[in-house]
Design a protein with these regions (language model features):
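Intrinsically disordered, low-complexity serine/threonine-rich segments
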Residues: 11, 28, 36-38, 43, ...
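Contiguous, well-ordered beta-strand patches that form the walls/edges
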Residues: 52-55, 75-152, 159, 171
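Sec-dependent N-terminal signal peptides
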Residues: 6-13
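Low-complexity, Ser/Thr/Pro-rich intrinsically disordered segments found in N-terminal tails, propeptides
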Residues: 35, 45-50, 54-67
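Signal peptide-directed secreted proteins
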Residues: 149, 153-183
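Bacterial Sec-dependent N-terminal signal peptides
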Residues: 2-4, 16-45, 170-183
Length: 183
């Protein structure tokens, strides 16, 4: 009898942990919608970038987040710390600033960027440019795939004869970030 009570307690703890983590199986992929993205209202959410480092326990939350403003548009924010401000001169002050604005087309649980505007702090002001107008970028694609409370970004590019792929993981949170944090 005690054996079954222990097993039940362990299973209950596992179910609670999975529910708390917002885990979903791959066959639970959601079609992209305002509620899935957390556009507004009771479902309002933010997507925090996740960076896992080998050999370190826990998950590190990187210095960026995405806020979807509609089913087909998003704003991406980047956190600038004191070194970014004083040494690198990348921002006017410490905090989050708009990094990119993205327009998407949607299909199932994927969003594919059709237009990307990025910002750069130059000579004391923010300058906005379009990916398509960049002389260094010959081709690019940016796709987000959503599975439950997780999202994967894949950015593929060709620039001056070099090409590459960058992948970033995100998790959905309900509080607007005020600074990078660790879990």
């Amino acid at each position: 009898m005690r054996k079954f009570a222990k097993i039940s307690a362990v299973l209950a703890a596992m179910v609670l942990a999975l529910a708390f983590a917002g885990c979903k199986s791959d066959d639970d992929d959601d079609d992209v919608s305002g509620s899935t993205l957390g556009v507004s209202g009771a479902e309002k959410a933010y997507w925090i970038s996740v960076k896992e480092k080998k050999g370190e326990v826990g998950v590190k939350y990187a210095k960026s987040y995405i806020e979807f403003t509609s089913d087909t548009t998003a704003k991406c924010y980047k956190y600038y710390d004191q070194d970014d401000v004083n040494i690198k001169k990348e921002a006017p002050s410490v905090g989050y600033f708009l990094d990119t604005e993205v327009t998407f087309k949607t299909s199932g649980n994927s969003l594919t960027a059709t237009d990307v505007k990025f910002s750069e702090y130059k000579n004391g002001a923010w300058v906005y440019e379009n990916f398509n107008d960049s002389p260094d970028l010959t081709s690019w694609s940016l796709t987000y795939t959503i599975s439950g409370s997780e999202m994967t970004e894949v950015f593929e590019y060709t620039s001056k004869g070099e090409s590459g792929t960058e992948t970033t993981k995100y998790i959905k949170v309900t509080e607007k970030p005020t600074a990078p944090y660790k879990k």
